[in-house]
């Protein structure tokens, strides 16, 4: 058994994901695939278009064998924390042979050598970084300059000696390269036997909002869905199984979810918790004062985000910060989990027969607990990390479903994490 690990959001699963899946299997000679997938809220600090079970089912229908939920506390954070959670899960399974991710760079060796320097932080590199930061450069620019200087001083790293500062900076700051470097850094920190691979992203940029071919970015699809929920205009850019499942959800009253839908809930929390806003993760440096001031004059969430945005606070950073407030994510809880080197449990969202084979392998090779639904938990809840992780997953699901099920309230019998089974795809 040769098991490939994938780290995904599938928001939604489109033709580019089919390409990534097939090329990853081809590159690694994998016989089985496991996807670690974000739940109902995502790394950009926004809700998923459709619920985690629907997205997991679509993934398995399109060729993934097993989908495991990435806990909310990891799923909604920076690339560093997001990657740490996903890689820690894969490493804790003790049966994953490789990971494969898309990147703008497309060269595993280059990304690995960059990650190795950033993971080990040699003294020369740290001194160079400090110098550029002391010169007043922003961290991304300072890091690129320090890395460029270090590489040209260290003869071992001739793999990118010909890169200019601009090329290196672009490599370091491209969306998928950032995640890929963080994946590899975490593999190094964990001394993992999992082998990293990458494939080049094709045609569409990660953040592109244009639909120009049959492979486009998820961003472009989300932008299109926000303007028109009729899926017919997306038929050429998503697989048939994705199209059919999402069409059925929409026909049954489950509309795509966007962050503005949660603005009233967020506004209530901000007005109620003004005195304690700084307890939420990423609420630092007095930003709570700007949030409180601008909440009164903002009619929509996007309006609030843009009002707070500045050179110091990027839009993505603002979105994550506000999402942390929405989900009640506290600094103290993030401190508890952000450096753990094992995960106490995995939550299964969907699987097929080959996924069953993977689960059997996990049971044979790992002590990790496997959860199908929270009502079936039969082991001790004394584990603080375990309790912290699942409590936020439950909160996130409940908050998400309060809007997602507004046209289907009769289907909600209580906290759905307690009674929803993993989806088996024959």
UniProtKB/Swiss-Prot annotation:
GO terms for cellular component: cytoplasm. The keyword Endoplasmic reticulum does not apply. GO terms for molecular function: ATP binding; ligase activity, forming carbon-nitrogen bonds; tRNA binding. Pfam families: HIGH_NTase1 (PF05636). Signal peptide: none annotated. It comes from the Bacteria. InterPro entries: Rossmann-like_a/b/a_fold, tRNA(Met)_cyd_acetate_ligase. It is found in: Cytoplasm. It catalyses: cytidine(34) in elongator tRNA(Met) + acetate + ATP = N(4)-acetylcytidine(34) in elongator tRNA(Met) + AMP + diphosphate. The keyword Ligase applies. Its EC number is 6.3.4.-. Disulfide bonds: none annotated. Keywords: ATP-binding, Cytoplasm, Ligase, Nucleotide-binding, RNA-binding, tRNA processing, tRNA-binding. GO terms for biological process: tRNA modification. ATP binds at residues 7-20, 102, 176, 201. NCBIfam families: PRK13670.1. Belongs to the TmcAL family. Catalyzes the formation of N(4)-acetylcytidine (ac(4)C) at the wobble position of elongator tRNA(Met), using acetate and ATP as substrates. First activates an acetate ion to form acetyladenylate (Ac-AMP) and then transfers the acetyl group to tRNA to form ac(4)C34. This is tRNA(Met) cytidine acetate ligase. It comes from Clostridioides difficile (strain 630). The gene is tmcAL.
